[in-house]
Amino acid sequence: MSWAGKILRVNLTAGTVKTEALNTEWARSYIGSRGLGSKYLVTEVDPKVDPLSPENKIIWATGPLTGTMASTGGRYTVITKGPLTGAIACSNSGGYWGAELKMAGWDMIIFEGKSPKPVYLYINDDEVELRDAGHLWGQSVWKTEEVLKSSLQDPLVRVSSIGKAGENGVLYAAVVNDLHRAAGRSGVGAVMGSKNLKAIAVRGTKGVGNIRDPKAFMKTTFEKKKILAENAVTGQGLPAYGTQVLMNVINEIGALPTRNHRDVQFEGAKDISAEAMVTPRESDGKKHLVTNQACFGCTIACGRISKMDENHFTVQNKPQYWGANGGLEYEAAWALGAANGVNDLEALQYANLLCNEYGMDPISFGATVGAVMELYEMGVLTKEQIGVDAPFGSAAALAAFAEMTGRGEGFGKEIGMGSARLTKKYGHPDLSMSVKGQEFPAYDGRAIQGIGLAYATSNRGACHLRGYTIASEVLGIPVKTDPVESEGKPELVKAFQDATAAFDSSGLCVFTTFAWGVADLAPQLQAACNEEFTTEELEKIGERIWNMEREFNNAAGFTAKDDSLPKRLLTEAAKTGASKGMVSKLPEMLPKYYAARGWDTEGRPTAETRARLSL
């Protein structure tokens, strides 16, 4: 059946742990991971709950293909009500932690309440225990993992933890595993910190052996891996260059948000690109990139391992940052770089290391810095207030802000609120490039119309991974659509959103969708699970998950007015590139999107839609 069939319920207030049987009826309807975890959350949590209160819950959930031999089967999702947005938060991570939990015999962990003191959860197959984490509180993600592996005398234990950002309530704090893989968005780490939960250490030795039809599963996964290997993106581009290969591509078409979205092209893009990562540095003749790295069971291996110049001003006399470590991804390179006009690759790598070490989302952090730099250049913020000179392009300011925010010091406390709260506090809310309070990723909605609609309607706030229309609008996958045209984009966005929900819930990585469709996922799930997951059924399940998340947000107080974009994208035309003179056509697309979804004009699923999806 592929599901382990068991979940852990941890009451942090009482300090108790109990085992429950997985709800198999829900598993049939929502698969696992994002979908199934969200079903538990929306059933058990009041949508109007304070995200940082003991009444909120936080869930770690794997999918039925997590821990199996399916390519990219290392994913898990952290689900909660997010403090950055007040909406449902489903944040996905790779690495090895998810597979380890599944191999220990667990599908999911539900945490409720709040511990009176710092604790961590230790899982060794069926042995589960809450343990004191007083000695870990205040430690970085890296130190926490080091100490736990040493004290448990097990170098193979996998750790999912928070750093100082989560402890200090940074509203976009991340949950980090394997040192630099993260459930990074929406502030799931802040919820973890609010519960005095420092880490989950897992050791699993059982394996995942309950495959419905092992021979059929082996056959279909082999066939699907072959498709990945032969695809230009998953078999060549991502392994060789990683996601950062998009930097020059997106810049050339005029879709790279620059200086807090004032511009759509960055003159320094080439300096922070994937090509720059493999070019020897002038300072020491060494390349930034050391090698690529794969998550559990992944045949793509898009991860980057890089090494900084030891003489760069950010790491002089800081040997802890000199070794090979988790490298830049495209989104982080953009948010720390182009979004702020910074083209110092070493400074970007340093800020990214701090995001990993302290446990915070580099997208929201970098985009918030962009808003701060604009407020500084406007004269709204001064050096005396923020501690440094912070014009656009300042690598020194970027590094200083990363240190302040991660440690919860000085003006870093305000940067930790996110751009929506910060810009509102200083009288310029329109300068927050966010949706529902969550900062934009690395694509401009004026130059790529579909992604703008995807941002506006995302259930967790601005997000590219909830409906990655870039595949179609830029890369031509599975079909090429014109990025500056709005016709057909509502239907395109819906299709991507629903398919992504199904992939996220399976336990596989969304990057497989560069080569696969839902029709490729279906036979893998059918061979693994004791259910008939046809292509049509998976598409319907994806749509069901999307609408379930939407209804939680509606009940939390979100309405159609929250499906919007910043004023800048709706009224300030792009200055250069293919979209020169254009703004987002969201007002034209949104009503058509609602119609395609089967929602009323207020963005609520109709009775007919609810009945069709069995909500």
Residue spans for each PLM region:
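Intrinsically disordered, low-complexity segments enriched in small residues
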Residues: M1-N92, Y96-L615
